[in-house]
Amino acid sequence: MSAPLGYDLPLCYDLIVQQLIPGYASLARLAVALLAASPRASSSGAAVLVAGCGTGAELVEARAQRPDWQLTAIDPSAEMLAASQQRLDVESISWRQTTVEDLNADGCFAGALSVLVLQSLPDDGSKLAFLTALARSLEPGGQLVLVDLMAPERSTLQSQVEAAWMGFQQASGLKAEPHDLAPLTQGLHPIGEARLTALVNAAGFGDPARIFQALGYEGFLLQRRP
């Protein structure tokens, strides 16, 4: 992801996203806790994939909660990988500058985390390819925690929700201009829950179970079918 105008994205990404997304500060902790309680990843020394590690929020939390996990962190951005590596013990994590589609790690992981990645992919086969690759990388029965911006359902409350989101940003102290935030808020491809269900089923997962929601941002627990 390119940096917003006037910002060094890896340095300020976490602060900006906390001001944009309600509950973001707790997301990494919740995602790791959910995966740590899963049947496969609860075992000592479980192999866990962080797909799209960004600046390392999920990795930091995983190291705090489950220092025994064998972590693999992937991101197509060398800049983001470098930012993550500055926050963590580089030697204790397997780092790969790649996408999950090119990882070639079939059945290698007991669990996986993907936070704010799927939303950036168009629904032209790219979302399905991403989800299929994630399912393929998991052991049968392995779980994925997926968090993304979702398309709003038709609701008479939608305008109120949008106004609340703007109010949240202002109350959080977000000072950036809209054009500065464009890479974080525009060019995204959110989908509705029905479409997500169809895609994850086609990819090899069971139905998504919602485990988090804050305005338009939702988290789901997915399990690879046997």
List the predicted regions and their residue ranges.
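Short catalytic micro-motifs in class I SAM-dependent methyltransferases
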Residues: 116-120
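Core SAM-dependent methyltransferase catalytic element
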Residues: 197, 203-226
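Class I SAM-dependent methyltransferase SAM/SAH-binding core
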Residues: 47-51, 55-102
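Conserved class I S-adenosyl-L-methionine
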Residues: 1-42
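A short glycine-rich, Lys/Arg-flanked "PGG" loop and its adjoining helix->strand segment in the class I
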Residues: 128-140
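C-terminal alpha-helical "lid/dimerization" subdomain adjacent to the S-adenosyl-L-methionine
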Residues: 149-202
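Conserved beta-strand signature within the Rossmann-like core of class I S-adenosyl-L-methionine
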Residues: 141-149
